[in-house]
Structures are given as structure tokens and as C-alpha cells.
């Protein structure tokens, strides 16, 4: 190292801060005034010895010092920039290259490479450890400095607040004292002398009568004005702070607030000592203001149920309703302040406004119901199987059940088809079996799906002469989706065109493989008319039921599913239910969807009244508050109150969900109307049917007829006869009333006749769909179509002083008529559309010219006809539009 090394340069070489190097030099006994002073070699040696002593190492011998003086180490640093490609952009990185070289004078012993490497590693490790310790010390020093700064700021703020509180308390105390003095000065000063030695009479327990409104307040006691040493509870309001002069202003303010705790916020009146309080509002409040402005945005956790109104959401967010409505408009949701919105929309707008939304559990009554239903635990016993008969329409499902039950249900059904689910239980030689008969018509898809979910075994009836049909394939899919085993009954084998093998091959294409073909599906050939093979079918059902090991709890509260429901004029709401667990008895309280009630009576399919219904037994229940939806679950509860609470809660949720959905669809209709310029044609319907399943099937089938030109809208549907309210709603909305196996009462007929409402009665679902199609087609109007009736080719063009350009033409196709519109085509491109001015043949006006005939054609208001053009004659016709 040269003799001209400065302290700053030395600090860079040894990688030490300049301040620390100055401290080390001062510790070694060398005083330097600045980092630019020169450090000699002897001073460096002295510093090295000091550092070695401070680290507990012996100083170097003179010969070692001489050897170290003969060796010099140079450190070189070079900085450069490197460009790095990172994806689509480029990043510039600063890179520092450090080089270190050691030079030894001649005569000094050169270190071996291993010794040099070890020495370098040792020095690097020591330097790294030293730097780490220094960095930790600096970080700790910075942390302590920051904490001291924060603490000083907090103390300063606290002192300032304390000073402000003391100042405010002092001002309020002075104001209170001044008010008390003014009050005392305004009262009469002459009083009768009071004998202090006489004993005071005891205070009466009863309150003194109130002074009249206009009377002046009683004068203060002279001893209260003069005696400053009296107890605090005997002093008047003027000397309230007299005994607190030695306290701080904050303590006086605190004590003043505690003394006013019994004032109850009313100006005037009496305090605890019987004196008058200050009449001004807040006159005795010596404490600081209670409100503090928040320093950060307040984030609230808002509990939101399935639906919530905009007003309730705004109240929970502590915002104005208009702000929430504005946020909804920005999100594309048009809602009013009283409108209900769903949970997802409410959660999105809550997050948009900077708060957190959590899902609220508003199913307290539902949870209590589930808890009570879960208490039904007992020993499971074997139960009868539930078998659903499915298949295509007119394949013999009901006839099969008629033979098993020895009844004639099929002959009494309208149109010879089943239009609702029938539930029966039959005592067979193989045991009790419960049967569900489902409709086969395409409109009753939901009924078939519901029957597949309730059943244990599906019997698929396929006609041997008809084969696999669309509803047959649909029944197979329902059975697969429900995970129910399948048994195929090939019916009508007694007919001449029966081919059971063809049926099996067609079922094979639907992945239904018979046992004869190596599969696992039992297929039985039967005849529902003669009874052939019925016993084999019952045997197959019994074997399948034994394999399933069907069990259920036969005691305790009952629960199950509604199969069908209707409204009987004499008996009220009637629900056909299938018990799945427990025992249903007369007098039980049950909840069924949004309906509830007490079981007044039970009826089986024969009309008898059983004492109870166990698992897998279908019965009719009377006593519900309304007609339940087909497919709803029912459960027996302890009391009517719980049943009513659960039903009302479900009804409220369903109504709110319906309102939310209606609002959304109404807004979509408005936007669609604005987009098209004119809205769709709408056909409003009011549907009333005898059973709930028929209502569902009709609603789904008729709404499915809607397209982009017309929309079928079911404004109301229900079970039972057509009532006065149904007629009024139909008249108000100009709807067509459809009665399916029901009739209108006298009052409804009067309204229908007076308002001209379209009323139609049906008993077969085919007729309903066909009639609605016709009515909807009438609303569509007609469509204008253009039909080309003739084409003439221009051969030459003549000029006429009266008509202008006349095209000598040959009719090459169809007929050209005089009073029909025409188009002029050139190179198969329409260049003009208008009408004929003249049509002549041999200089005579004619009405039409047929194929293969020459004629002269003058086009009105067009003279640019050229040879080779084609004149196309067409007519416009009206075609009725259909669905």
C-alpha cells in the first residue's frame, strides 16, 4: 500500500464504513479530523495491532510484519449493465465484477496455491461474519431509533390531547361557575334567619309537590352559598368544582361526568343533592367529545341470506339506499330500493362497495325440523319393494297393473292413456308389492323421472309388436340416472305381429342386454290381456327385491314423498304420499313442502281407512292447509307450531326467489324488446287441472312451445276447479283459460262470459297441445312470400314515342302477367324492381303471355333495357305462420 493512502481509500479496501474506521483509529490512539487525511504504513501497523488485541489475538512479530510489508493485495471493482430477456420485455441488471490479486516482493516466501486459497477463504469468512455483525448492529440501532421516534410522537400527541382536555375542562368549569353565580344573583337575597342550633326536622319520605309552571324556582340556601366547607352532596351547582381545585382538569372533567350520570339527559330537574341542574343542553358535560372520526375505511362483515331487499342491504352497509342502487346500476342490475336481490348479486355489490359478505343461515326452523326428523332411530326391518311401471304410451302398462290388481282402470281413463301417477299396493303370493303407474306420453317426463327416484325396481314394458320407442329410451335413461335395477316385460306376445327377439335386439342397441345374451337384465314375455307370464314377472320382482335387501325403520315419526296431489271439492286438499320411514298415523302433524297440517284421515287405493301406513305403503292424506307440490318431501313433527313455522319460512323463501327471478326475466324482456324494436307475441295461459302432476306436465309442455316469435306465458296454474279469482286474473291479462278435467263454477262463468275470456275444457293432453299450437299460430299472423311465376328474355329493344324503350322479349319460363310486379336482371344481378307499363302481342294489349311466346314489354319509369336482360315476373302471397 502506498504512503498516500487516505482513510476513505483504506475503508474501501478493507470493506468497512468510514465512520467505523475513524472510531477504530481513535481507539488505537490516533486522532484524525476527516476521511481525506493520509494514513501511513506505521499507523496501519498500529491499527492492525490494536484490532488483533481487541479480538484476543497476539500481535505479529517484526519479521511477520516485514513479510506482510513485502506483500500487497489489490482489489479491483468494475461495474457494467447486462440486458436480460424476460418474456416480452427486457430488463437491465447492474453487475459488479470484483477481482483480487496479491503481489509478493522478491525475497519473500511465496504461498502455495492451497495455502493462498485457504487464506483467502478464511479472510472472506471473517469479513463476511464481520459485515453480518455490523449489519445486525446497524439494523438494531435503526429499530431502536424508530421506536424512540414513534414513542416521542405518541407522547407528544398524548400531551397535546391532555392539554386540550384540561383547557376545555377548565373553560367548562369556569362557564359552570359563572352560570351558578348568575343564577344566585338573580334570586332574592333576603331570607328569614335560620337557627343553626335548632334541630332540623326529619325529611319527609314523600316527594314535595311540584311547583307550578310559571312559579320561580326556590331560592338557594344561605348556608349553601356561604359554607364552602360543607360536604359535596350539600353544595349547590355553583360550587360544584370548588373542592376539586387541587385536581387536574382531566380529573375534574371525569368527576363531573360521573356526577351527571343520573341526569338521564334531561335539561333542568333535580340533581342528587336536590339542587337545580343547568338548564342548557350539555351544560354539565365537562368531558371530551364522544365522536372520533375514523382514520381508515370501515370494512363491515354483512350477513346475507338467500335473498335480501336493497333497503335492508343499505342499512347493513350503513349507506344510503341510493348509493346501493347506483352501484347496482353500474353492475348492470336495474333494481329499486324495495326490490329483492339474490345472494350472489348482493355479495357482488357488497364487495364492490368495499365490504365483506358472509352467508347467513336463515333456516332456523328448517334446522329444528331436520334435528327432530333425525331423532327417529330404531331397528330396521324388511319392507316391501316399490316397483314403478314405465314404458311408451299404449304399450300396456296400466293393463298389466289391472290384471295384477284384478281391476279395470285402463278402460276408464280418458283417451285410454294414463295422465297421472297411480299408486297401489298388492298382496301377491310372493308378498306385498307397491306399484307406481307412470304416464307414457312425452309431456309427462317429470312424472316419469319422479317415479324413477321413488322406486326400488323399474319394470320396463315394451310392446312386442311395436318395439323400442322414444319414451322407452327415456325410461331407460331415468332408471340409469336413478341407479335403479331394471326388469323388462315384453308385452302383447299374444298378438299376431309379436316379435320378442326383435325387441331384445333393439334393446341391445340401448345397452340393455338380456340374460339370454349374456347380460344381467331379466326379460319376461307376458300378455296383460290373457295373464300369460304374469307369475314369472312377479317371481322376477321378488328375486330382485331379495337381492336388494330392502329395509326401513317401522316405528317412530314418518317421512316420505308426495306422489300426487289434488283438490277435492268435498274433502279439500288431498295428497297421495309414499311412506319411506316410520309409521304415519291419524292425528300426526306433518310438513309437506310449503303446506302443513294435521292428518284428519288416511285412505288406501280401495277407499278404506287404515289405522296407519308403514314403509313402502302409499296412502291418501287429508288435512293439509293447501295442495302440495308433487315430489315434495313430507315429515312428521312434534307440534303444529313447528310445522307452521317451517312452512311459512319455506313459502317466504320461495316467494322471494320467485320475485328475484321474475324481476330478472322482466328486465331481460325489456332489453330484448329494445333490441328488436318490437317484442315477441305473448300468449298468456291460466291452467287448472285435477291433480298437481298434470299441472306440472301441462305447464312444461306448453312453455316448451315458445320460440323467438311467440312466447307462451303461464301466468297462473293450480289444482281444482276454475274459480272467480282465476277468471279475474285471466280477464285482466287477456289470457286463455285451460281446464284439464275440471270445470268453472257459476261465479267464474259469469265473469268469463261478461269479459269474453277464452275458456277451453280438455281431458286428453294431446288435445291441449294441439289447441294451444293453433291459438299461438293465429297470433303469429301471416308471412309474405314472393313466388316467381314467369321469366322473359330480352331479344331486342325498340323505341316508342309514347312508351319509350320497349323490350322485344321471349317468355322462356312460366307466365308473364300484366298486373304483377317485375324485376330486371342483368348478368343474374337485379338492377331494377318495378311494374309493367305495357304488355303487348302483335300491337294488342294482353293480360298475360305464356311460355314460348314473343311479346313487347314496356317497363314503367325505366328505359335502360338492353338485349340479353331478363325480366322476372313474380307475385306476393300470404302464408299463415305456424309453430
Swiss-Prot record:
Keyword field: Cytoplasm, GTP-binding, Initiation factor, Nucleotide-binding, Protein biosynthesis
Ranges of biased composition (kind: Low complexity): 172-185, 256-265
Domain tr-type G: 382-551
Region feature (G2): 416-420
The UniProt record lists the keyword Membrane: no
GO molecular function: GTP binding; GTPase activity; guanosine tetraphosphate binding; translation initiation factor activity
Chain positions covered by the region annotation G1: 391-398
Sequence ranges of Polar residues compositional bias: 81-90
Region (G3): 437-440
Region (G5): 527-529
Record field: compositional bias (Basic and acidic residues): 221-238
GO cellular component, one term: cytosol
Binding site for GTP: 391-398, 437-441, 491-494
Classification via Gene3D superfamilies: P-loop containing nucleotide triphosphate hydrolases (3.40.50.300), Putative DNA-binding domain, N-terminal subdomain of bacterial translation initiation factor IF2 (3.30.56.50), Translation factors (2.40.30.10), Translation initiation factor IF- 2, domain 3 (3.40.50.10050)
Residue numbers spanned by region G4: 491-494
Region named Disordered: 53-90, 171-294
Superkingdom of this protein's organism: Bacteria
Summary of the function given for this chain in its UniProt record: One of the essential components for the initiation of protein synthesis. Protects formylmethionyl-tRNA from spontaneous hydrolysis and promotes its binding to the 30S ribosomal subunits. Also involved in the hydrolysis of GTP during the formation of the 70S ribosomal complex.
Family of the protein in this entry: Belongs to the TRAFAC class translation factor GTPase superfamily. Classic translation factor GTPase family. IF-2 subfamily.
Record-given protein name: Translation initiation factor IF-2
Organism of derivation: Stenotrophomonas maltophilia (strain R551-3)
Lineage: Bacteria, Pseudomonadati, Pseudomonadota, Gammaproteobacteria, Lysobacterales
Gene that encodes it: infB
Amino acid at each position: 500500500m502506498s504512503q498516500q493512502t487516505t482513510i476513505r481509500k483504506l475503508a474501501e479496501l478493507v470493506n468497512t464504513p468510514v465512520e467505523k474506521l475513524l472510531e477504530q483509529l481513535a481507539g488505537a490512539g490516533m486522532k484524525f479530523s476527516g476521511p481525506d487525511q493520509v494514513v501511513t504504513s506505521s499507523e496501519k501497523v498500529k491499527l492492525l495491532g490494536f484490532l488483533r488485541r481487541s479480538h484476543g489475538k497476539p500481535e505479529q512479530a517484526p519479521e511477520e510484519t516485514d513479510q506482510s510489508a513485502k506483500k500487497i493485495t489489490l482489489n479491483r471493482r468494475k461495474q457494467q449493465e447486462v440486458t436480460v430477456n424476460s418474456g416480452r420485455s427486457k430488463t437491465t441488471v447492474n453487475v459488479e465484477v470484483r477481482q483480487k490479486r496479491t503481489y509478493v516482493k522478491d525475497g519473500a516466501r511465496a504461498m502455495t496455491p492451497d495455502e493462498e486459497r485457504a487464506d483467502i477463504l478464511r479472510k472472506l469468512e471473517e469479513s463476511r461474519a464481520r459485515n453480518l455483525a455490523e449489519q445486525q448492529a446497524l439494523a438494531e440501532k435503526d429499530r431502536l431509533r424508530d421506536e424512540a421516534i414513534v414513542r416521542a410522537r405518541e407522547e407528544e400527541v398524548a400531551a397535546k390531547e391532555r392539554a386540550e382536555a384540561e383547557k376545555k375542562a377548565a373553560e367548562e368549569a369556569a362557564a359552570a361557575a359563572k352560570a351558578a353565580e348568575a343564577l344566585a344573583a338573580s334570586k332574592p337575597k333576603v331570607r328569614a334567619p335560620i337557627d343553626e342550633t335548632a334541630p332540623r326536622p326529619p325529611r319527609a319520605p314523600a316527594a314535595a309537590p311540584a311547583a307550578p309552571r310559571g312559579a320561580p324556582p326556590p331560592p338557594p340556601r344561605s348556608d349553601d352559598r356561604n359554607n364552602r366547607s360543607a360536604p359535596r352532596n350539600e353544595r349547590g351547582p355553583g360550587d360544584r368544582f370548588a373542592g376539586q381545585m387541587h385536581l387536574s382538569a382531566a380529573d375534574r372533567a371525569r368527576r363531573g361526568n360521573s356526577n351527571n350520570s343520573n341526569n338521564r339527559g334531561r335539561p333542568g330537574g333535580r340533581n342528587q343533592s336536590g339542587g337545580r341542574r343547568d338548564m342548557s343542553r350539555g351544560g354539565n358535560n365537562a368531558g371530551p367529545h364522544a365522536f372520533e372520526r375514523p382514520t381508515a375505511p370501515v370494512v363491515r362483515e354483512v350477513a346475507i341470506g338467500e335473498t335480501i331487499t336493497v333497503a335492508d342491504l343499505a342499512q347493513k352497509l350503513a349507506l344510503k339506499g341510493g348509493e346501493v342502487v347506483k352501484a347496482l346500476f353500474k353492475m348492470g342490475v336495474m333494481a329499486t330500493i324495495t326490490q329483492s336481490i339474490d345472494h350472489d348479486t348482493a355479495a357482488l355489490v357488497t364487495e364492490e362497495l368495499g365490504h365483506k359478505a358472509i352467508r347467513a343461515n336463515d333456516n332456523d326452523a328448517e334446522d329444528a325440523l331436520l334435528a327432530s326428523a333425525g331423532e327417529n332411530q330404531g331397528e330396521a326391518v324388511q319392507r316391501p319393494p316399490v316397483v314403478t311401471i314405465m314404458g311408451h304410451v299404449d304399450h300396456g302398462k296400466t293393463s298389466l297393473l289391472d290384471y295384477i290388481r284384478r281391476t279395470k282402470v285402463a278402460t276408464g281413463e280418458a283417451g285410454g292413456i294414463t295422465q297421472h301417477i297411480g299408486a297401489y299396493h298388492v298382496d301377491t303370493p310372493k308378498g306385498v308389492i307397491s306399484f307406481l303407474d307412470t304416464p307414457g306420453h312425452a309431456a309427462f317426463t317429470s312424472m316419469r323421472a319422479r317415479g324413477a327416484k321413488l322406486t326400488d325396481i323399474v319394470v320396463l314394458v315394451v310392446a312386442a309388436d311395436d318395439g323400442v320407442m322414444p319414451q322407452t329410451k327415456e325410461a331407460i335413461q331415468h332408471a340409469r340416472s336413478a341407479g335403479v335395477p331394471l326388469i323388462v316385460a315384453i308385452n302383447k306376445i299374444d298378438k299376431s305381429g309379436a316379435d320378442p327377439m326383435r325387441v331384445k335386439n333393439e334393446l341391445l342397441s340401448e345397452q340393455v342386454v338380456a340374460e339370454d345374451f349374456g347380460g344381467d337384465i331379466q326379460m319376461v314375455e307376458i300378455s296383460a290381456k290373457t295373464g300369460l307370464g304374469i307369475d314369472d314377472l312377479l317371481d322376477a320382482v321378488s328375486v330382485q327385491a331379495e337381492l336388494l335387501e330392502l329395509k326401513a325403520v317401522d316405528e317412530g315419526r314418518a317421512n316420505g314423498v308426495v306422489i300426487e296431489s289434488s283438490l277435492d271439492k268435498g274433502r279439500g286438499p288431498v295428497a297421495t304420499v309414499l311412506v319411506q320411514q316410520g309409521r304415519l298415523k291419524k292425528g300426526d302433524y306433518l310438513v309437506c313442502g310449503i303446506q302443513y297440517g294435521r292428518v284428519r284421515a288416511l285412505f288406501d287405493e280401495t277407499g278404506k281407512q287404515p289405522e296407519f301406513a308403514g314403509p313402502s305403503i302409499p296412502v291418501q292424506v287429508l288435512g293439509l292447509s293447501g295442495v302440495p307440490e308433487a315430489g315434495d318431501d313430507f315429515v312428521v313433527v312434534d307440534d303444529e307450531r313447528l310445522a307452521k313455522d317451517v312452512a311459512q319460512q319455506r313459502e317466504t323463501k320461495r316467494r322471494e326467489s320467485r320475485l328475484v327471478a321474475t324481476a330478472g326475466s322482466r328486465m331481460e324482456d325489456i332489453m330484448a324488446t329494445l333490441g328488436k324494436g318490437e317484442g315477441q307475441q305473448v300468449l298468456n295461459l291460466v291452467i287448472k287441472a285435477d291433480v298437481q302432476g298434470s299441472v306440472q306436465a301441462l305447464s312444461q309442455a306448453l312453455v316448451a312451445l315458445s320460440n323467438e316469435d311467440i312466447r307462451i306465458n303461464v301466468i297462473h296454474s293450480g289444482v281444482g276447479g276454475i274459480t272467480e279469482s282465476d277468471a279475474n286474473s285471466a280477464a285482466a291479462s287477456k289470457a286463455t283459460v285451460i281446464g284439464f278435467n275440471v270445470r268453472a263454477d257459476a261465479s267464474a262463468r259469469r265473469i268469463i262470459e261478461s269479459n269474453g275470456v277464452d275458456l277451453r275444457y280438455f281431458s286428453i293432453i294431446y288435445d291441449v297441445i294441439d289447441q294451444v299450437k293453433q291459438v299461438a299460430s293465429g297470433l303469429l299472423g301471416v308471412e309474405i312470400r314472393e313466388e316467381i311465376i314467369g321469366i322473359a328474355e330480352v331479344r331486342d329493344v325498340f323505341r316508342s314515342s309514347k312508351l319509350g324503350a320497349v323490350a322485344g322479349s321471349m317468355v322462356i319460363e312460366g307466365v308473364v302477367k300484366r298486373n304483377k310486379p317485375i324485376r330486371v336482371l342483368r348478368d343474374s344481378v337485379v338492377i331494377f324492381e318495378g311494374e309493367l307499363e305495357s304488355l303487348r302481342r302483335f300491337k294488342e294489349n294482353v293480360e298475360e303471355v305464356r311460355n314460348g311466346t314473343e311479346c313487347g314489354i314496356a317497363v314503367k319509369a325505366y328505359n335502360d333495357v338492353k338485349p340479353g336482360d331478363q325480366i322476372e315476373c313474380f307475385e306476393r302471397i300470404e302464408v299463415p305462420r305456424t309453430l
